[in-house]
C-alpha cells in the first residue's frame, strides 16, 4: 500500500486522519494546507504534531508544513522544531534551507500531486461531518478514491 497524503487544517482533522490510518494499517503523510505556515503558523503546526506524537505514539505518520514560497517561514518552522517542511524557493535558497534542515535532523519535501483535503469534509453541509470525514478517509486510504 502506497503512502497517502491528507491535508489537515486543525488538530481534530489530524487526529481523525491518524486514527483512521492506524485502524486500516495504512501509511499516512499529513500535510498542512498550501501556505500553511502563513495560515496556521509554525508553532501551531508543531503543537499539532506534538499532540499526535503523544496521543498516537504508534503512528508512523509524517507531518509536513507547507511554507509556500516564503523562505523566512521555512526557517522559522525549522527553528520552531518542525521536522518536515515543504518550500518552493530558488535552488540556491533551497540549498541553504536544506543545510539548516539537515543540521536539525529535519527534511525538505516537494509538493504532492494527489492528496485528500479534509476541508471538503469540514465544509460539508451534512449533519454528521465526523462520519463524512471518516468515510472519505477510509475510501482514500484504501485507494478507492482521489481528492473529492
What are these regions (language model features)?
Residues 11-19, 43-46, 71-75, 79, ...:
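Amphipathic, non-transmembrane alpha-helical secondary structure
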Residues 49-57, 78, 98-102:
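Surface-exposed amphipathic alpha-helices with a cationic face
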Residues 62-100:
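Mid-chain, well-packed structural core segment of small domains
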Residues 40, 73-75, 119-121:
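Short, solvent-exposed polar/charged micro-motifs at secondary-structure junctions
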Residues 2-11, 59-68, 115-128:
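Active-site mouth loops of central-metabolism enzymes
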Residues 25-27, 32-36, 90-148:
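Conserved anion-binding
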Residues 1-61:
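Conserved N-terminal beta1-alpha1 strand-loop-helix module at the mouth
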Residues 22-27, 76-85, 104-107:
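Glycine-enriched alpha-helix->loop->beta-strand junction motifs that scaffold or abut catalytic
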